[in-house]
Amino acid sequence: MQKSRMIYEDVNALIEQEGTRDPHDILISRKVTVLPFRMDTNILGMYTDVVGKKFVFYNRRLDETMKRMVLAHELGHNFYHYDYADLSTAESMSKKSNEELEANIFAAHLLIKTEDILSLYEEGYDINEIASFLYVRPELCNIKLSELQKMGYKIAGNFSIQSDFFKNIKGMDEENWDSEFVHEDPDFFDF
């Protein structure tokens, strides 16, 4: 089966099974502990396994849109990459890049309903407008549309795919923060 179709079908089966698209609820249902990082960091999120116990950590300052995307991405790692957290730096970067792309495809299918993105795209909205309407980043819209094309949907256009776009988003950039953190004293940490 084509990888694009497999991920799409896996996500839809998961949504059907869980009765939700909410990545936080699904992670909890899958017995993954979801916690914010205790300190400020540029890292958006991380999936790890510690002695058989699965964790997702996320940047505590993220706004809800970004947090949802990060949790959906980390859920993709939980679903497909059980050994992801164990990859050593000596391993191939292409394997890591491929796993990042799979997690992004998973997140795009989880957070974006096919009928919603197709309807908005056919109405003539551009990627940035669609992303705004759907509360995701444009990169996820590009991934979703590209994957739908690969599955045979007739969609005009070329969609640039960045497998590592999350890596380029810094958790310490205020534009990604929840408004409660924007004017906080940067020297204050609530542990």
Describe the residue ranges of each PLM region.
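Active-site hotspot residues in diverse enzymes, especially metal/ion-binding acidic/histidine motifs
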Residues: M1-F191
